[in-house]
Each structure stands twice: as structure tokens, then as C-alpha cells.
């Protein structure tokens, strides 16, 4: 793709530039405010050569835009030493955090513009080079200037994993109401050398160009081939590349401004069309209400949302024997004596394994979903009791806050991950989208349809990072749940555990059961299957959870 960029275009004169650029910026400023009001998010990625002027192009835009609705994320240098250390450890963990975590963390809300100065493509290319060559400076074969040594197969594999993650990230943003604009600032080898040497010679800017960057100038041809392949493989219809001639900053500024104006105009037009369609649909679905029939039932529950038809399949590899609620054996139990002995033994083993896990820098994520009063909290306590308090975090999932609602659903979980070597325990999770939000009608049918594979993509990223991911469904029969509800209601010490919402959810058992079965079917992947904890006997469920965690750590090569 880079050969499409004409680097020999004549420079634009100052007068023509000012007139054209000023008009574009005026339009862009207006569109930014409209996007802010309509909650249209804009993600703007600047990739390109070192010294191509990415930072300057962003600065020129930031000078004119509303700073209250813009942010800039500067992607730091790839840490080769960290990558080598994790690779040498031999546990398939790629770093302290997943590849895409920093970019999710920096994502602004809908209605804002988020600029990325370098981003996921730079990191993907650097990871691939590091995997192939053990660093960012390819070693050339002696006597062959155009040939480099390295593990090309490993590089292609790493690049493939990264590009798959990138595609899901960009697709998810677009599906969630963001516009994604990607610029690659291209300059010639001579132009790059001249700029970097000029920066290095100026005491004011010399700090921006270290020795390693200057050394990489000699890798231009090899880096060109990597960039070109990367651009070809990621020129998605929903997030295409705009190639920019970086040799002329005036021409570059005009192309960038034109592209952003077109992107926001297109996004706002789609938003208006979607709002009109939604309003028309709502108007056509309104039914006359009889004076004798209240809109809400006596207990205050709202009218049920229409039945949702889940997708038939997934883009991801699903296991053939996904669990079902019908297959649960509710009679499984342990005697108090068996429970006491096994609990003590397993907790000791987990404590020792967790210490080894920390030293090996393996992240562990244990996620709990289940019926109200199924015993999630008590199960979590017995797991946490086995761990060093400094090594784990329990992440609850209450109703989302206003900032969380202004971001994609998974943003609140991408920003709540355990560091490599630590444990994250999730008391309810990202599956709320396909459970409570589905049953209560909080999410649109379109977003629900997309949610299953968005979750699968998220979990694939976690597993590719090297995390041990365990997904527990804590199951209890309706009869046992009713007994526990009544016990809580009659016991002053436990009354805080039972709410009106619990009773309302119980009344919606058929809707939740259908949602759960669809969840099992569409998110029981080969890399992150569901595990049912039969919890009519809480003792049995607690021991099974501990057994499962211990086995997973041992399967990862750890020993106690």
C-alpha cells in the first residue's frame, strides 16, 4: 500500500494552504460540538515512521479543537527487556498486561475525540520483530545486505495474533458508536534520516531521539515490508487506512483535516438515521392502554421486553459439549467431615501454588456468575482465604456508573484486570450484558447479537496474554433458592442479603434460564469453557471450585 503514496508532489503554497485549511478547521470545530451532543465518539490513530511528524500533526489539531472533549494517548517505547524476560520464563505470558489493555484504558467516552500517537499497530510490529529477532534491530546475514536472520514463523504467528485482536477491537468500537480513523504518515528513507538527525543535533529536541532510534534508520527497507504487510492486512472496510504524504506538512494537515471532516459528517448522518429509525419503531410499537390495565404490574415491574433470538453460532471455536442447566445433578454433596478435610488440604495447596504463580508471573482470573443466593459470595471467600491478601483483588460488578455507560460495555473490565502474577476474582462479570441486560431489555437486540462474540474476543485476548481464565456458573435449584430466600428474610442477620430485585428476578426464571442456556452455547469456547458449580450443597461447590483452580495451576506447569 505504501507505494500508493506520491512523495514527490509539489509543495502547497502558503496562501492556498491557509484558505483551505482554515475552512476545514472551522468545519471540524463545528462537527466536534455536534458529535459531543450526539455522543458520537471519534478514535484517531496516527501511525508512521519515527520522525514523520505524528506528534506535530496532532498538536496542530489540538490547538483548534475543544480541549474538554479531546485526549491524547502517547504509546511508550516497546520494552524489549520485559518481553525477553517473559519469553525466557517459558509460561507463554506475553507481559505484565494484555497487548490491547493500554489502548482500552486510554479510550475516551462517546462524544469525545481520542488521539493515539502511535498505537496498536506499532506495538504489534515491534512484538513481531522482537519475537523473530530477540530485539528491534534485525541482524543481517553476513555478506547479504538484503537478508536478515530471525524466526520468521514466530514473527508471522505473533503478528497474526495481534491483528486478530486489533480487528475485534476496531470492529467493536464501530459497532458501539465510535468512528475509527487511521492515518499512516509516510516519508522516504532519506526524509526520515534527515529529520531524525536534525532532531538529534538540536539540544532542545535531542532527548526525543536516542541512540537506538538512530540505529534503526538502517532497517528502513525491512521495516517498510513489515508496515506494508500490516497495512494491507488491516485495511478493514469499517476502519480503512488513510495514507498521508509526510514530506509536506501543509499537504498532510489538509489531508488529515479533510478525512476527519468526512468521518464526522458520515458518523453524524448515521446517528441521525439510527435515531429516526428508533423513534419510528418506538412509535409503531405503542399499543393503546386500557384504563383498567396499568402500564406496570402491582409489584412495580415494567412491561416485559420482546423475546430476543440469540445468534445461531459464533465466529469462535465453540466446544461440542457445552454445559446445560438440564444436565446439572442437584444431589451432589459432601459430608461436613469430607468438606473440612478437603477444604483444608486444597486451601494449603492453593496457597503454595499461588506463591509459585506470582514468581512465574502468570495472571489468574476467576469469574463467578450464578443465581441469586446460589452461594457465590461464600465460594469467593473460601478461595480468597487461600491467597496472600496482597496478591488478589475482588472486582464486583454493580450497576454501571455514568462514565462506564459512556464507554463500550467491556471498557469497565479492560480497566479492571490483574497484573501478571496476581489474581483477579470477579463477583459477577461482563456476562451481565447477555443476562440481566437481555432479560430487562437494557441492551438493544443488535448490541445483544454482537455481545456474545465481543465477549469471546475479550476472553481470547486474555488467554493469548497468558492468563488462566476460569468461568464458574454457580447453580442452585429453584426449590433450594426459595428455601434460602425465606431463610434470609426471616433472619435479621441475613436480611440485608435479600432485596425486592431478588424476588423479581426469581419470577423471571424462564427468561433467565433461556438467556443462560444461550450464554453457555455461544460462549463455551475451546479456550474459555464454562464450569458449573453444583451448589445445592454449598460445601460441594466450594471444594469443586478449589479443586478446579488447583488443577488449572498445575496444568500450567506449576507445582506445590
Regions found by a protein language model. Give the residues of each.
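Glycine-rich phosphate-binding loop of ATP-dependent small-molecule kinases
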Residues: 1-560
Amino acid at each position: 500500500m505504501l507505494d500508493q503514496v506520491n512523495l514527490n508532489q509539489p509543495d502547497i503554497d502558503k496562501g492556498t494552504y491557509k484558505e483551505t485549511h482554515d475552512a476545514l478547521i472551522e468545519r471540524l470545530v463545528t462537527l466536534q460540538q455536534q458529535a459531543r451532543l450526539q455522543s458520537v465518539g471519534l478514535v484517531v490513530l496516527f501511525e508512521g515512521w519515527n520522525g514523520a511528524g505524528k506528534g506535530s500533526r496532532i498538536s496542530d489539531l489540538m490547538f483548534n479543537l475543544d480541549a474538554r472533549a479531546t485526549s491524547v494517548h502517547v504509546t511508550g517505547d516497546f520494552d524489549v527487556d520485559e518481553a525477553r524476560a517473559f519469553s525466557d520464563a517459558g509460561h507463554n505470558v506475553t507481559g505484565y498486561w494484555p497487548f490491547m489493555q493500554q489502548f482500552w484504558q486510554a479510550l475516551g467516552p462517546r462524544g469525545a475525540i481520542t488521539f493515539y500517537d502511535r498505537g496498536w499497530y506499532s506495538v504489534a510490529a515491534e512484538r513481531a520483530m522482537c519475537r523473530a529477532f530477540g530485539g528491534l534491530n534485525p541482524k543481517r546475514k553476513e555478506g547479504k545486505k538484503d537478508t536478515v536472520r530471525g524466526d520468521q514463523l514466530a514473527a508471522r504467528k505473533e503478528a497474526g495474533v495481534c491483528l486478530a485482536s486489533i480487528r475485534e477491537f476496531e470492529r467493536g468500537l464501530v459497532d458501539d458508536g465510535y468512528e475509527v480513523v487511521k492515518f499512516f504518515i509516510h516519508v522516504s528513507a532519506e526524509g526520515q534520516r534527515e529529520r531524525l538527525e536534525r532532531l538529534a543535533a538540536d539540544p532542545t529536541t535531542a532527548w526525543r531521539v536516542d541512540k537506538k532510534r538512530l540505529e534503526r534508520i538502517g532497517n528502513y527497507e525491512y521495516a517498510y515490508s513489515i508496515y506494508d504487510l500490516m497495512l494491507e492486512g488491516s485495511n478493514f472496510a469499517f476502519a480503512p487506512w488513510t495514507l498521508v504524504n509526510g514530506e509536506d506538512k501543509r499537504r498532510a494537515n489538509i489531508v488529515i483535516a479533510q478525512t476527519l471532516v468526512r468521518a464526522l459528517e458520515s458518523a453524524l448522518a448515521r446517528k441521525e438515521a439510527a435515531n429516526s429509525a428508533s423513534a419510528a419503531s418506538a412509535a409503531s410499537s405503542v399499543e393503546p392502554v386500557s384504563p383498567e390495565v396499568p402500564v406496570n404490574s402491582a409489584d412495580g415491574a415494567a412491561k416485559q421486553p420482546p423475546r430476543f433470538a440469540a445468534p445461531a453460532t459464533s465466529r469462535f471455536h465453540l466446544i461440542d459439549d457445552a454445559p446445560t442447566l438440564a444436565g446439572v445433578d442437584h444431589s451432589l454433596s459432601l459430608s461436613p467431615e469430607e468438606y473440612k478435610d478437603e477444604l483444608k488440604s486444597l486451601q494449603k495447596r492453593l496457597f503454595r501454588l499461588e506463591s509459585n504463580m506470582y514468581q512465574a508471573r502468570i495472571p489468574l482470573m476467576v469469574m463467578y456468575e450464578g443465581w441469586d443466593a446460589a452461594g457465590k459470595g461464600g465460594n469467593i471467600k473460601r478461595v480468597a482465604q487461600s491467597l496472600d491478601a496482597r496478591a488478589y483483588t475482588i472486582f464486583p460488578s454493580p450497576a454501571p456508573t455514568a462514565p462506564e455507560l459512556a464507554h463500550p460495555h467491556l471498557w469497565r473490565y479492560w480497566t479492571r484486570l490483574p497484573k501478571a502474577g496476581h489474581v483477579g476474582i470477579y463477583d459477577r462479570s461482563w456476562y451481565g450484558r447477555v443476562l440481566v441486560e437481555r432479560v430487562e431489555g437494557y441492551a438493544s437486540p443488535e448490541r445483544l447479537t454482537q455481545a456474545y462474540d465481543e465477549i469471546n474476543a475479550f476472553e481470547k485476548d486474555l488467554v493469548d496474554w497468558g492468563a488462566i481464565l476460569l468461568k464458574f456458573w454457580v447453580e442452585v435449584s429453584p426449590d433450594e433458592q426459595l428455601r434460602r430466600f425465606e431463610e434470609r428474610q426471616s433472619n435479621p442477620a441475613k436480611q440485608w442479603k435479600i432485596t425486592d430485585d431478588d424476588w423479581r428476578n426469581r419470577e423471571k426464571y424462564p427468561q433467565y434460564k433461556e438467556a443462560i442456556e444461550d450464554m453457555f452455547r455461544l460462549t463455551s469456547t475451546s479456550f474459555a469453557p464454562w464450569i458449573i458449580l453444583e451448589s445445592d450443597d454449598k460445601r460441594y461447590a466450594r471444594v469443586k471450585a478449589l479443586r478446579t483452580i488447583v488443577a488449572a495451576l498445575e496444568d500450567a506447569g506449576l507445582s506445590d
